[in-house]
């Protein structure tokens, strides 16, 4: 299986990499949050742009991206607008969503973009090609904050992302029971062993699913999300605790 290298970080080998999400509403809070995050122990900085108020002003969005780049130049920067339908803060049109991601790609400030699988097949394929032409990696994602589908469906979605040439397919699902967590882990393992030719990221959310955020190296998830301050999704644990557990499991 091929790995994905962003800056000096190799994703898809060793312990799962830690991603943290920065959620700030304006330039001033982007700056202050970035300074606080700079001291934390993590691998990839995700900027959750859907929390940013001045979204219609592309210059303002890119000015904020520039601050993040300048504050943490060595950290891979993942640009993510999470749509309202997949658990994000704002709803925008598909056209605006694609335009925003293209602007991020054009800026030269971001290393990776998050692209939701169910945006529309043609738009997704075109945006992946555009990102790759500009040396930007794509994390292709799907989130369900209500339920966990059958393992076959989880695998089908991850394989579809892979067929669309995502660098890293990602799926996050809400368990309604502990057996749903096992479904997610079994699907992850089957995907990783039988179909994946690149790193994947999977997680089961909320307190019930916490084990999935810790056991990625065992089942085949290449990265996990931790919290510096406020969790960006239910079930995230602090980066310091997360690193400790991931290291213990890696060295066992």
UniProtKB/Swiss-Prot annotation:
It catalyses: 3-dehydroquinate = 3-dehydroshikimate + H2O. It is an enzyme of class 4 (lyase). Pathway: Metabolic intermediate biosynthesis; chorismate biosynthesis; chorismate from D-erythrose 4-phosphate and phosphoenolpyruvate: step 3/7. Its EC number is 4.2.1.10. InterPro entries: 3-dehydroquinate_DH_AS (IPR018508), Aldolase_TIM (IPR013785), DHquinase_I (IPR001381), Type-I_3-dehydroquinase (IPR050146). Keywords: Amino-acid biosynthesis, Aromatic amino acid biosynthesis, Lyase, Schiff base. The keyword Amino-acid biosynthesis applies. GO terms for biological process: 3,4-dihydroxybenzoate biosynthetic process; amino acid biosynthetic process; aromatic amino acid family biosynthetic process; chorismate biosynthetic process. Involved in the third step of the chorismate pathway, which leads to the biosynthesis of aromatic amino acids. Catalyzes the cis-dehydration of 3-dehydroquinate (DHQ) and introduces the first double bond of the aromatic ring to yield 3-dehydroshikimate. This is 3-dehydroquinate dehydratase.
């Amino acid at each position: 299986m091929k790995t994905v290298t962003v800056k000096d970080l190799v994703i898809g080998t060793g312990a799962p990499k830690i991603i943290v999400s920065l959620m700030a509403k304006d330039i001033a809070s982007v700056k202050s949050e970035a300074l606080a995050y700079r001291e934390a122990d993590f691998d990839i900085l995700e900027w959750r742009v859907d929390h940013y108020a001045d979204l219609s002003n592309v210059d303002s969005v890119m000015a904020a991206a520039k601050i993040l780049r300048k504050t943490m130049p060595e950290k891979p920067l993942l640009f993510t607008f999470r749509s309202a339908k997949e658990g994000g803060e704002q709803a925008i049109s598909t056209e605006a969503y694609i335009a925003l991601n293209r602007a991020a790609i054009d800026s030269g400030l971001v290393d990776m973009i998050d692209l939701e699988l169910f945006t529309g097949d043609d738009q997704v394929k075109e945006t992946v090609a555009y990102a790759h032409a500009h040396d930007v990696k794509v994390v292709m994602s799907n989130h369900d904050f209500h339920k966990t589908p059958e393992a076959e469906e989880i695998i089908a979605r991850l394989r579809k992302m892979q067929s669309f040439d995502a660098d890293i397919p990602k799926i996050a699902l809400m368990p309604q029971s502990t057996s749903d967590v096992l479904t997610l882990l079994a699907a992850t393992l089957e995907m990783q062993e039988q179909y994946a030719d690149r790193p994947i990221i999977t997680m089961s959310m909320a307190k019930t699913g916490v084990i999935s955020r810790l056991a990625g190296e065992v089942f085949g998830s290449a990265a996990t999300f931790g919290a510096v301050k406020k969790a960006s999704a239910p079930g995230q644990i602090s980066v310091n605790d997360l690193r400790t557990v991931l290291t213990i499991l890696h060295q066992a």
